[in-house]
Amino acid sequence: MAQVSSEHSDRSPEFWRQKADEYAQKGDFVNQAVALGNLSLALQEQGEWEQAQESSTQGIQILQQLSTTKERDQILAQSLDIQGKLSFSVGDFSAALVSWQEAGKLYQQLGLTEAEDRNRLNQVQAMQELGLFQSACEAIGARIDENVSFCAGVKLENLPENLRRFAGDRLMVLHLQALGDTLRLMGDLESSQQVLELGLELVDGDTETFDKLQLSLGNTWRAKGDRQWAIAQSATSTIQFNFEFCPILENQEEYDSALKHYQNVSENNPLLKLQANLNQLNLQVALNQNILDFNPLEEAQNLNLFNTQSGNNLILNTLQTATCISTIPWQNIAQNLQTIIDVSQQRKDLKTQSYALGYLGRLYEQHAQDSKEYLQTAKTNTQKALSIAQSLDLNAPELAYQWQWQLGRILEKTQSPYSEILSAYKAAFNTLQSLRQELVSSNRDLQFSFRDEVEPVYRKYVDLLLQNNPSQDNLKEARNVIEALQLAELDDFFNDACITAQESKLEDIASDTAVLYPILLDGKIAVIYTLSDSLIDYTIEPLSNPQRFERTINALINDLKEDINNNYQQYGQTVYDSLFSDKLKSFLSSHDQIKTLVFVLDGQLRNLPMATLYDGEKYLIEKYALAVAPGLNLLAPGSLNSLDLRILPGGLAQKAPSFDLVHARLNPLSNALSELESIAQLFENQTPVVLDESFTVEVIKSYFANVYYSIFHWVTHGQFSSNPEETFILTWNERLGVNQLNELIQSQAEFSSEPIELLVLSACETAEGDNRAALGLAGVSIRAGSRSTVATLWKVDDRATSEFMSQFYQEMIENKKTKAEALKTVQESFLSGEKGEALRDPRFWAAFVLIGHWI
């Protein structure tokens, strides 16, 4: 039986046209369709996309009009495969997936397992391009082993031994490669590595598959390095305010592994070797290392990569890298971008066209200092790229946001009207809001560095909104942008857009409460403040030396943590003066009904207890009850009902096996039992204290079957970090990460849908040297579903903690105070000397912070 096959594509299009005509004249319609399919393949090889589409469509239509037979169905499946390949090559991934899915059904009906497996690999490619990672993972995972949950987001401890039956089976090893790639795109990097390494063990002499796996492993190690670098940047670097054309990475050991795998790709397959070389080049340039001695553009031209969408992607990535190599003339890069624009227009590949135009605009923006005319060229190309990205035929918001931001930068550099610049940034912000899921994707096409490519848009937009005597509408928009930034940071922290935000209503906030939004901008600090009646205003204070301000915050935190210096009042006053301008102080004094200040904090300020800000005479806690909110839109609704409170007290008083699971030396919390028992006595129908050997996930869960607990008070070691993998608390035998803690507390949702009222973690601390460690505290609070969380930012003497927490509950339960008022009362009693002269020092009372609802 004749077949449609790429093996025949070395014949000229004219040969297949002649064959198609001959078969048509004979009335042999099946073979006519075969010839038309092969004609389409031959035309694709020459880049004749429209003619290839016509031939493919004609062949399929002929087959669809014939009666169903085994031969007809097999040829139809092959023809649909070719049509899918064509659609994929021109960047129409949705059409490609539809064609391949139709072909796959036919192969399954015909029992052609090998053809079905090849087809499945094609489908997965299309799903990956469309961002349908879960569907791709499930499709490929079910074929490999339907009894293994590859796609559940749970780390694979050990791969099943029976997968070794695929040794030497090229197609199934390629399935493992596709699964590893998909797991990487889903962000499950450890499982991706495991699956790909198993595939490498099972290759058995197939050099092409070996090379594909090496390339995939290199990409997974690169993704692991990028993640570690992002975490390190988050912890130690200052805020990035401006766009970086060529950001430099810091070396991670994962990058060394990536380079090794790229170098392991053999010369046998020129295209795979080029991909590996390009990925290696990209990484070495980003690491500021010596680069490969080869001309990637010349090799790309030799391999005819300008004719396909995937080839264009390779070239575009190369050109992006080339812009950061000083020895490559940027005009050469511009010429190559123009070539891609031309061929993608011929191919009607809108996505590639938008990318190339946008990159061309960015290239001219990058070199704008050479000529004023370059900025106009940059603007024109950026606008074209944006228009295509927003067209109904493409609708690619992940591109549109980049070009909207780029347009805003260019408009600012050309000193365009304020309204035009603001409009561009507003558009970029709105597009970002629609892109929450994509922003946490690990897809290299969609992957954004939060610090470099997302956060600066929010901060610049707020900066613009606060210029030119802002209206109430602009002030409210600025407040909303800050709220959105808080949410985006948490999405980035979890690598998952899983948090549900709800629009807060300021009128629901009591009139005695003011909400303050400090935000660090380029060279200044702004504070937006608002009352329940929707009155909103702002102050801006210049920071002549932002680095010095950050050092002051760090010095204050270190002084509070360590019993070395006593400069915390001096540092506290410096920070107070930066946040509380004369205008803000005047506002607060003229609204003497304000009793509570709620801070939505930014950057390093999150690590600092606001109670320690000092006005020269008093600490802020002496004037106001204080709380920190991760954002008003993230607060759980409702109010405290002390009549219905049930507490589950637990913790560790002895040295536990889990202490060995962390690097730091931990001491037993010898006063844990007295703290827990004194608190438990304040509640009726009290559950016994869950202590030491009983403080395990299994025992805690066993209590949920009979009672709904609204308060969890746990005295145990733990750490908050900007790295979710380093954010944890300890049970007797486990180190619970933020997601495991969430699963534990939320497991009682089987018995009640009510939110948890209060989570107290009274022996935790923030990670040393981590500027955004308190982000982990906010993450714990939100993931646990708690309306409020009380925790310590550093370790406090456990005797002082026991006394502090006992009084806190007395004030809240017996004296009916809000959580913020109760915390204020206890902190003032320590400060006044009521608890003893030794405990007046802020080191003993300032570590306790209230996150979330203050009522």
Task: Write out the residue ranges for each language-model feature.
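Short beta-strand scaffold segments in enzyme catalytic cores
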Residues: 525-529, 679, 848-849
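Alpha-helical solenoid repeat scaffolds used for protein-protein interaction
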Residues: 117, 125-128, 133-165, 169-573, ...
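An often Trp-containing, charged/polar helix-loop segment at the C-terminal end
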Residues: 592, 801-855
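Catalytic-core domains of enzymes
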Residues: 499, 508-509, 603-711, 726-730
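N-terminal leader/linker segments that initiate helical-solenoid repeat arrays
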Residues: 1-38
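Catalytic cores of nucleophile-dependent amide-cleaving enzymes
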Residues: 630-633, 710-803, 807
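Non-membrane alpha-helical segments in proteins
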Residues: 31-45, 75-89, 121-125, 177-181
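Solvent-exposed loop/turn segments at secondary-structure junctions
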Residues: 41, 85, 522, 603-607, ...
